Amino acid sequence: GNLDEILVYLATCNGLIIDVRDNGGGNLTNSSRIAARFTNSKILTGFIQHKTGTGHSDFSQPEPIYLEPSNSIRWQKKVVILTNRRCYSATNDFVNLMRSIDNGKIIQVGDQTGGGSGLPFTSELPNGWSIRFSASPHFDKNMQPLEEGILPDIAIDMTEDDQSKHRDTLIEKAFEILSE
């Protein structure tokens, strides 16, 4: 598909910058499909639990989640993922999937993600208010909760001075990493 064309087009580059800052989420299937382009083997990416009863702590045992490599073109070079606190839901899941690939080539730069990977449940209350909460706790491969976000490998904040000068310090750091 189109991703094959893009990866072929970018094949001469030293690496890839994936900027997911301010991305509120989307489709979990797309997160997996994209991340599958960066691994050559099946990998454990985390665990999920499901509600099993009415009690506060009535959850199933953690069930493993795996990422299978794509059967299409896969990227073999460095990747820098740019994140901030406004990366939620499927974006948070994508960052976790990418961080689970232990090939030494994927680096998260920026700020902690916003979290929210737990398959949200939404309902309307009798008074018309809506409620939304994580229905299935989601953990990384080390059993650390993903709901509160994922810390970057390299933490960088854009200063007000940088913003006023339209200087993107995260992009600059990504270029620095890719040129090493």
Predicted regions located by residue number:
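Extended C-terminal subregions enriched in glycine
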Residues: K78-S100, K105-G114
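C-terminal soluble interaction/assembly domains
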Residues: G110-P126, I131-F133, F139, P145-I156
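Intrinsically disordered, Ser/Thr/Pro/Gly-rich linkers and terminal tails that flank
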Residues: N2-N14, T29-R33, K141-E180
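Loop/turn elements at helix/coil->beta-strand transitions in domains of secreted/extracellular proteins
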Residues: T12-L16, S41-L44, Q76-K78, D102-I107, ...
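Terminal peptide-recognition signature
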Residues: I18, F38, V79, M98, ...
